[in-house]
Amino acid sequence: MRYRFNGRSFLLLGTALVLTFGWRAEAQTQEQVQAPMSLEQCRDLALEHNKQIQMAQADAVASDYLVQSAKTKYLPRVDFAGAWINPGDRAIRPFAIDFNIPGVTPPGLSIPLDLISVAPREIYTGGFTLRQPIFMGGKIVEANKMARYTSDLAHEKVKMKEADVLATVDEAYWRVLSVQEKVRLAQTYKSLLDHLVQDLENVYAEGMTTRNEVLKVQVKQNEAELTLVKAQNGLQLSKMLLGQIIGLEAEQIELDSEIISEEQLSSLLLALENSNAERAEIVMLRSKLALTESARKMVKSQFLPNVFLTAGYNWVEPNIYKGSQNNLGGDWMVGIGVQVPILTWGDRIHQVHIADQEVAKAELELQDAQEMITLQVQQNRFKHAEALKKMELTKLSKEQAEENLRITKNNLLEGMNSVRDILEAQTMWEKAASEDIDARVEAAVTLSELEKTTGALYQYATEHTKAREEK
């Protein structure tokens, strides 16, 4: 049998294919978005999404063009100028007297009056001019240096913005994981109370306990449910904050379930100790110091002469080179120009003193920043060391609280402990587990702060920039 396809059949077939592949693509996209994201993925998204970084990158690109523009100052300038002039009826009047003056006009030289009578006519003029700097007192050299220093400042500003964003996204990332763990903890705590309420109700039904004991646990059960609701709301808000940083909706964010471990912290800290990165602020201040030094040399160049070559070719009509004939005439010229400063009443000296103060100020800023950064690094090292010790102790407290809860639960079944004892043990366990979560997050956040103060985040930003440019 031979099948015949009409236009409607092709339309239905095409629609089915589009819907099928579209559904698969959408499902694949949702699966990709919903996949747990690592810290590195969140960092990359934040660096690509942040508007402040994009503006700083635009400034850096503009500074690169400034460097290229400064290089052209070494090259000759060629200009063209032209004009059309209509002198009017009274602009040039014919001579009405005899130009042959006795005693003045040389013997044998007679200028007829009709030859020196100039009738009004239009004037056309134009020409090319070339100007080539030869020696400008070092102005062009220093201008190129200043352009490069400005470009360095702009690129380091990009790194500084990126490091700020990285520190922000790190903190938001760990906060989401912290609240995520708090939600799990609240769910576990509520589950423990639910089982305890069920057990006590069974015991109460057998007449082995009082209704008062059941009500005590039910009150705790209600409190645990409220805590769970608050934790879930906090998780949604923390995801919204992280999503605003990385450019995703809160529903699209799913992070790795585990908070950083001691082994991961140790490896990251070891890598940090071996890093030789430098803060962008220090690099920027060094560039600023070099910029002020070049500016001082630029001011001192005002004491030196400027030498330049000039050349050109000009046209004019009427042709002044051939008795003002009504045609186009031209001639070339070449020369050397020299400009020597002589007297400015001390203005240049005062400008040099101002430049000296700017250099001294830049040196002090650099020294002050180096001292402050050294102090910040030491402070953050202490904070991270304290966080690691706190994480160690809270982990031990959590293990002890778990053991205490287990023993108390067994004693309750044997009649050796009361409901009050089991509630206290559960509360102690919940508090110890919550403090353990906070301690691990604090250790991760303080490590991120240490990475920023030591310059490791700037190195990460630099590597990310190189990878983006290679793509």
Predicted regions and their residues:
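Periplasmic alpha-helical coiled-coil/stalk elements that build and connect Gram-negative outer-membrane
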Residues: 2-3, 9, 37, 65, ...
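Amphipathic alpha-helical coiled-coil segments
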Residues: 55-70, 161, 165-184, 195, ...
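Small/polar (Gly/Ser/Thr/Ala-rich) solvent-exposed segments
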Residues: 54, 77-92, 115-121, 131-160, ...
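Bacterial N-terminal signal peptides
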Residues: 12-20
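Sec/Tat signal peptide C-region and signal peptidase I cleavage site
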Residues: 23-27
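Small/polar, glycine/serine/threonine/aspartate-rich low-complexity segments that form flexible
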Residues: 31-34, 81-129, 256-265, 297, ...
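Acidic, low-complexity, intrinsically disordered peripheral segments
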Residues: 2-6, 28-32, 79, 86-92, ...
